[in-house]
């Protein structure tokens, strides 16, 4: 990831922050397959939300999940709603993860409740820093590469993490963005924007980038092969318009509707999505930039030391030389077990996984078995064995039934049934 991107995040965050200060309202998070109860949407801290997002992106081994964390219940619900068994038989699809600044909860997905809310919502600049941390962790896990396919000069970015694909950047000009916007939403709405104004140009370019992203995700969804790419985006154009023109301005109202339209399109073509809606910043806050910078740095807490099993193992490469090394390398067995000595071997510590019990909407308990070196994978061996042998036995019974019917059909009928002689009744 380039230094230019970090510099743009910093400058963009400063620009928006100086205009409005710090916001402490709640952010709303929408996730595919997970919807909160209308009257009981859970609210968690920014630090707990970091753990949930890390699980969603597959980098939870970098983050320590405490036993009494507010994130644990939500993660268990995610595990219950997305069956590992179904993903075993069906191809994985791309994961879309977007943060949208300047959009409130009630303005999106009327029929869908947020999965959860984030209390004391950090700024968009803090979320941008968090996304960068996730991207570094993704790259270190699979030696993949995160490519910035779109980048503007106030912190907006769209990236794709993929270990195999090569992606070109989305480039446009102010005139091209305005022309494309007019084709999408009409001439009347396009006439409200002035490409000589920086905030207008940024928003139009983000709309153009989202349109290209919709086309990209649509083509991906039609492919039958597995797709493990992850799209991570940070959109700040709407927030910039809010700061420039105000929440009651016509241009902001139109831009908000445009953003909701494109997010709904992404929702339709993306099988797995996460939308983080950051509400418009409250301009009444008077905190200084120095205070805000400190808040941004501490907003999501600290993850564990960024290593991926780089601690020393013993000579056979299967055990860790100490309990501490095992605990650090596996993030305390991903919170699903504990490190203990293996047999009678000296300097050999491995994870002993334990089961988790989650409840579904009907109040029924479900046991989740964990496996793997760091207890980070669900053990579906029992379900697989049941499905496998059920299929084999069922297929065998089907063949046996067909053969039995075929053999019966080849036998000659008895003489009584095949006789054509007419029976004549005698009279006396």
From Swiss-Prot:
It comes from the Eukaryota. It is a single-pass membrane protein. Keywords: Endoplasmic reticulum, Membrane, Signal, Transmembrane, Transmembrane helix. Residues 20-385 are lumenal. One of its GO terms (cellular component) is endoplasmic reticulum membrane. It is found in: Endoplasmic reticulum membrane. The keyword Transmembrane applies. The chain crosses the membrane at residues 386-406. Residues 407-428 are cytoplasmic. InterPro entries: Archenteron_Induction-Rel (IPR053065), Vps3844_C (IPR024382), Vps3844_N (IPR049205). Coiled coil: none annotated. One of its GO terms (biological process) is vesicle-mediated transport. It holds the Pfam family DUF6859. Residues 1-19 form the signal peptide. PANTHER family: DUF3844 DOMAIN-CONTAINING PROTEIN (PTHR36853:SF1), EXPRESSED PROTEIN (PTHR36853). This is Uncharacterized endoplasmic reticulum membrane protein C1709.03. It comes from Schizosaccharomyces pombe (strain 972 / ATCC 24843).
